[in-house]
């Protein structure tokens, strides 16, 4: 987490960290997720400091239905030093159905433990909260299993071979709901 003031070099720090890790063989295909309005600017920053690096800066057009196969094949077959993608584009790249199913099932199991604990300790508020969250997750799981999501499954995160994720303005992704009392 880079939480420095504006103008203190977070972008360059992120870029430099990625390329050093790649140079050391720790990673092979880093993905930079940046605000959609800044993808081109971020790509320019990379070229300013690392002009010899091969970087794929995505555009909205790369995610049009007619171009998705080309987009995926470019990432899979080219040896990019980095890939830059906007937040709105990144949100279109789902994890596989199997991974999402496993994640939801794990959360349901965790809630079952919380429900058992709350029931044993007569904690009605926590019990009701956990039951509500569990019902919501079960509905999500059912929708997923019935493949009613309406989402194009052609692109999934695992298929891209990304092994390091750098997220600029990551606060937009921190809305995981913890179970609190």
Segments the model singles out, each with a brief description of its role:
Residues 8-13, 17-166, 174-176, 180-181:
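SF2 helicase/translocase NTPase motor core
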């Amino acid at each position: 987490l880079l939480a420095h003031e504006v103008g203190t070099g977070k972008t360059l720090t992120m870029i430099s960290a990625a390329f050093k890790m790649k140079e050391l063989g720790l990673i092979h295909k880093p993905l930079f997720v940046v605000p959609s309005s800044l993808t081109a600017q971020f790509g320019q920053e990379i070229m300013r400091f690392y002009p010899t690096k091969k970087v794929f800066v995505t555009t909205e057009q790369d995610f049009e239905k007619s171009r998705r196969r080309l987009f995926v094949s470019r990432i899979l077959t080219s040896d990019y030093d980095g890939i830059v993608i906007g937040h709105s584009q990144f949100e279109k790249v789902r994890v596989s159905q199997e991974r999402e199913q496993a994640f939801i099932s794990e959360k349901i199991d965790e809630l079952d433990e919380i429900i058992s604990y709350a029931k044993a300790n007569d904690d009605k508020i926590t019990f009701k909260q956990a039951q509500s969250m569990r019902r919501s997750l079960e509905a999500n799981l059912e929708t997923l299993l019935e493949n009613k999501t309406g989402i194009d499954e052609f692109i999934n995160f695992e298929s891209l071979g990304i092994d390091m994720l750098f997220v600029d303005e990551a606060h937009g992704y921190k809305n995981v709901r913890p179970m609190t009392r």
